[in-house]
Swiss-Prot record:
It catalyses: AMP + diphosphate = 5-phospho-alpha-D-ribose 1-diphosphate + adenine. The keyword Cytoplasm applies. The keyword Glycosyltransferase applies. SUPFAM superfamilies: PRTase-like. This is Adenine phosphoribosyltransferase.
Length: 180
């Protein structure tokens, strides 16, 4: 039986020498691979009390929405600044070279709601840490964070003070595809 890792295409030396590019689109292009990825993420949520699934831009939307559907929960978006039309709250966080800002609608999370945060990948953890801070600022409680892939050795998990689970663990200097 295939594992999720078997569906992840690896492209050596892209976009530069020494990088092992992990292409998540190969999972999405294979119905069995995509179903397996979602099924494995659902298993990580067994017994977790949650009211809302929050997907981080942009691949967190791809994996978060089917999880929300399967679990009968609403799906909310954590987006890059300037992409949401209503009143928002925002959080700026550090990148390796510079900063980035994410935001959520102010009415996306209600006080006391338990939230599962979903993304495709954890590397350094900065984006998800900022997303969790937004959720807490809105009065929500982070129940769990679920990733499809975790890059071992980058210590992103250690940055997060929450229950974190990943479907698969990958090693090496890696960049994943960018869908937007």
């Amino acid at each position: 039986m295939k594992k999720v890792e078997d569906y992840i295409r690896t492209i050596p030396d892209f976009p530069e020498p020494g990088i092992m590019f992990r292409d998540v689109t190969s999972i999405l292009q294979d119905a069995e691979g995509f179903k397996l990825a979602i099924d494995e993420m659902i298993k990580l949520l067994d017994g977790v009390d949650c009211d809302v699934i929050a997907g981080a831009e942009s691949r967190g939307f791809i994996f978060g929405a089917p999880l929300a559907y399967a679990l009968g929960k609403p799906s909310v978006l954590v987006r890059k600044k300037g992409k949401l039309p209503c009143e928002t709250i925002e959080k700026t966080y550090d990148l390796e070279y510079g900063t980035a800002t994410i935001e959520m609608h102010k009415d996306a999370i209600k006080p006391g709601q338990k939230v599962v945060v979903v993304d495709d990948l954890i590397a350094t953890g900065g984006t998800i840490e900022a997303a969790c801070q937004l959720i807490e600022e809105l009065g929500g409680e982070v129940s769990k964070i679920v990733f499809l892939m975790e890059l071992a050795g980058l210590n992103g998990r250690e940055k997060l003070k929450y229950d974190v689970a990943s479907v698969c663990y990958l090693r090496g200097k890696i960049i994943t595809d960018f869908l937007g």
